[in-house]
Amino acid sequence: IEVIVIPTQPENSGPEPSVTPEVTPTPETTPTPEVTPTPEIIKDFQKPLDGVTRYILHRGDQTAAPENSMPAFEAAGRSGAEFVETDVRETGDGVLVVSHDDSLQRMCGEDRLISEMTYDEIRQYPIINGSNASQYPDNLIPSLEEYIACCNRYSMTPVLEIKSIRTEEGMASFMKLLSQSKKDPVVICFRIETLSKLRELGFGGRLQWIRTVRMTASMIQHCKKYNLDICSEYKNISMNDISNAHQNGLRISIWLCRDKDMTDIFRKMGADYIIYEKWLTDCENDFSNTI
């Protein structure tokens, strides 16, 4: 998932998004502006729907190797990650591969679209950018099948964001590969049409609808109709939103957390899933104990 702030029109007008309710001043205090929450402000715990927060590592271990690469997934497995997220695209000849971007430009230095290339053509361009890229000279864009096999080797749960699967054959291939996972996969997507299609095809696992606006009653009704959970951008969710989702039987996934304090805030708020990136700080070992 790439975090890019894009101005959007909220579905319903309302207060500015916040991760915690605004503190109501008492007669003895002077009203103060709303501030970014800290672990000290959020004191009341709210449990996740299943009783435990699950942590999803974003695009593999990006501190060890380039994002969405086999070395990054293998490093995640060796570090004990339980859930690992990646992005899925269909090539021009119908093979499902792992890549966040629609082009090879950023990771491989080749300005060509994945959807217009064959799988064999894509494999001609190694990944040359990202963490420690020079240490992996033969690092290629993985196939979805390779990613699933890696998750199976390390007992990780696949978390798959569908970026682009254009054909019926591609969707059938996706369903087949999901069935090869030893763990129950989680599938996420911005497009509710794609998620509803998976339900039509018989996928009974967890589906998450990615949203970049505040939660609304209409959104909740759509989720209940197709048995979807919500994957919310961190800046557009509050503790009351999470409570409301839980009351409607919906789970909330938060993206994207890049430090321990932010992760701790949303854990206390009752988030069911937290999508995070590893960070190179001394607190990383402390955080690993909560995964």
Question: What are the functions of these language-model segments?
Answer:
Residues 2-291:
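Phosphate-group recognition and catalysis centered on beta-loop-alpha active-site segments
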